[in-house]
Amino acid sequence: MNIKSVIAILATSWASQGVHAKTTNAQTMESADSASISEIVVTGTRGSGDIRHLPLNVTTIRRAEIEASHEQSLLPTVVRRVPGLMVTSRAMKGYGVSTGSSGNISLRGLVGSMGQMLVLIDGHPQYNGIYSHPISDSYNADMAERVEILRGPASMLYGSNAMGGVINIVTRQMDTDGCKTSLNISGGSYGTIETNATAMWKQRKWSTTASANYGRTDNHRPHMGFEQWGGMAKVGYDISKHWSASINANATAFTSRYPGSTDAPVYGAEQWIKRGVASASLTNRYGNSTGEVSVFTSFGFHKIDDGVKDPTASSNRYFRSKDALTGVSAYQSMRLWTDSRLTIGVDYQHIYGRAYYTSKETGEVLNTANKQSGRSYRNEIAGYADLRQDLMEWMTIDAGLRIDHHSVTGTELIPQVGMVARTPKAGEFKVMASKGYRNPTMRELYLYPPSNEELEPERIWNYELSWRRNTKGFNYGVNIFYIKGDNMIQVVNRKNVNTGKIENHGIEIDMEYPLDNHLTVYTNHSWLKMKNPVVAAPEYKGVFALNYHCGKWNVALTATEFTNLYTAVGENETKGSFMLLDLSASYRANSMLTLWARGENLLAERYEINLGYPMPKATAMAGICISL
């Protein structure tokens, strides 16, 4: 099936729903609304909004699904649920950082390791201040009430790095008076242990959430151990009927060992990583207006031993880095007249990074040649406005513009425009055009011999057409996109230059259908064509899941297929195809105790996601959940 065929199918479906009939009366629309599922999201709109009125494609993963996965990391659940989204892996547990690491998030041929995917926590950006990539080991399941994933550029609202999409982690907080406590303990293959404890409390105006987690594993290859500690705390206070405040902090520390690839082993390589996040916000909610002012920071301290290739030798220095992303964000969303919504906001970010080396023997800072060390301060300030207007009962238009000024690259204009048409039978037809961009990183500007202080931002335009129908019985969606961009940063003659181009197009499909009261089928598929392929982007990804629920039992069988996943590009292009079969089951013994078990790669498939890093064959985990 080619793109023209799918466009024809979408157009025919839309027409058959009678969306063009202006005679639709209020009673018909009310009936449609009662049959559809009204989903409220915050990603892509700043303030909360009904996804049926937004021209964006947002997937929401709720707390119940996060808990049912029994994963300590959020990312495996996100990969299963979002069409086309990929996260690289090299072992059973632990992504790591630096050379040989995994955790690279990709979507539509745009990748997080290049700063083209943005992760948010409560709407605040999270990335390394030197390399601008997400730190995938930081995103633990115990912090999340839900996760919202926006496919396609979101730079109009969130600025740099939101080229390929956004993953927004909304942190947990109790909404009703009372208290909840949970404890999870699990163990499995290769000495893997995962534990976490969470306590939540709310009394009148006050609410608190606190959690702590620990995990470790030997993994399936020698010298590939991983150990992690983490936790989060959140305090909320309702100042009045219209005003509330919250303070949120989380931290993680992990140690990761690195054996190198199977063809080029490395000895003695190890990483010690500490990451932290803190934010404070003041929120207002009135009948026709909502808004928020927040301050935030994310920071990290990295110490890395790169190891040596000779097993009889040892390295004599550590690579160290410090980075911080600190900012202020404010927005107000208001209804100016009937069926309208105007959102205006300002963002300020201060981005800091320092990279240097120290002696193992003395601890002193070493002088390095070839720009191996450096320090950078960059500032970014932006203002944006987004207007959403219902022209008719069944049609909404949306247009926005961001003006962003970066202290190095200057001023960038980022427009976005879209339209939604709603059918009488709970259908939504969406058209969207949006610009995405990212500013060059500290590494690209100042570190290592290829660095170039005259770099400009990367820029893309994304065009997409989608059809979705959400009812209480059957939900499905089809999305077509086309991406074209230039100014992509590449190394030419040993220097970073804005010369690369990108031209990608593809189709994304997802569907969920309850076969009866006990059995639900879910599936998603994506096809991607890239003029210039990139690592970690599969040409096809498909997920098929059966979820069975009966009494105290829950069983889920999931098959995930990857076709032509690029592990190397260029002259030595390499790609692989494989299918993974996973099975999980849980038994709720009583109101307090749940027992569960999970098996992954049950077919013992031999495959690689990172070139030279074979993944483990079949693995298993089992555990208990105690809820009070």
Region annotations inferred by a language model:
Residues 262-285, 321, 376-378, 426-428, ...:
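Outer-membrane beta-barrel signature, preferentially recognizing the C-terminal barrel domain
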Residues 124-151:
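Short acidic/polar hinge/loop motifs at secondary-structure boundaries
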Residues 217-224, 228, 242-325:
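Flexible loop and strand-edge segments within Gram-negative outer membrane beta-barrel domains
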Residues 166, 171-201, 212, 217-224:
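Short strand-turn segments of transmembrane beta-barrel domains in outer membranes
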Residues 205-209, 242-247, 287-292, 301, ...:
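Repeated loop/turn-to-beta-strand initiation elements of outer-membrane beta-barrel proteins
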Residues 76-124:
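Extracytoplasmic beta-strand/coil segments of soluble accessory domains associated
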Residues 21-67, 75:
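Short, acidic, small-residue-rich periplasmic hinge/interaction motif at the N-terminus
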Residues 390-393, 481-484, 498-568, 591-598, ...:
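Gram-negative outer-membrane beta-barrel transporters
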